[in-house]
Design a protein with these regions (language model features):
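A glycine-centered beta-loop-beta connector
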Residues: 27-30, 35-57, 98, 106-122
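Generic preference for well-ordered secondary structure
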Residues: 4-7, 16-19, 42, 47, ...
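The conserved cystathionine-beta-synthase
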Residues: 13-32, 37-41, 85-102, 109, ...
Length: 151
């Protein structure tokens, strides 16, 4: 399975010069803890990811330091040049990338590095658990059939 099949499309995004408080409110409204920061692409109606902001970035990097978030823009706290997962990349490769750099989410991009979606560790785990449950169900069914035939 590739990343493009599993990722969540149309992720919540922000621009670098957006007000940080407004973006925090957007996170709350949309029930997300991760926003991809984008800039317009040279390709029509596409956007390229240039950074990410997490709820943790805001809490640890701003609030806990006593900095007034009203005085900041997204670009002041975003992580720049995020690692990316490509749409055609395998889910296993994306998982290894996440583990190597210590993140739980990656922006997903197309061939021209235009933003397509976001893949998270939770998405991958949910998919794997579902597949394991399906496999376990098949094994149980086979065992039940075998027992019935032996009677």
């Amino acid at each position: 399975m590739n990343v493009g099949e599993l990722c969540k499309r149309a992720p919540v995004t922000a621009k670098p010069f957006d007000d940080l408080v407004a973006v925090a409110q957007l996170m709350r409204k949309e029930h997300v803890g991760y926003i991809v920061v984008v800039e317009p692409s040279v390709h029509e109606s596409a956007f390229n990811p240039i950074g990410v902001v997490t709820d943790r970035d805001i809490v640890i990097g701003v609030v806990a330091k006593g900095v007034d978030p009203k005085s900041l823009q997204v670009s002041d706290v975003m992580s720049r040049e995020p690692a990316l997962a490509f749409e055609e990349e395998s889910v296993g490769a994306a998982l290894r990338k996440m583990r190597k750099i210590g993140v739980r989410r990656l922006p997903v991009v197309g061939k021209l590095e235009e933003l397509i979606g976001v893949i998270s560790l939770d998405d991958i785990i949910d998919k794997l658990v579902g597949e394991l449950e399906d496999a376990a169900g098949s094994i149980r069914s086979e065992q039940m059939i075998e027992r019935a035939l032996r009677k």
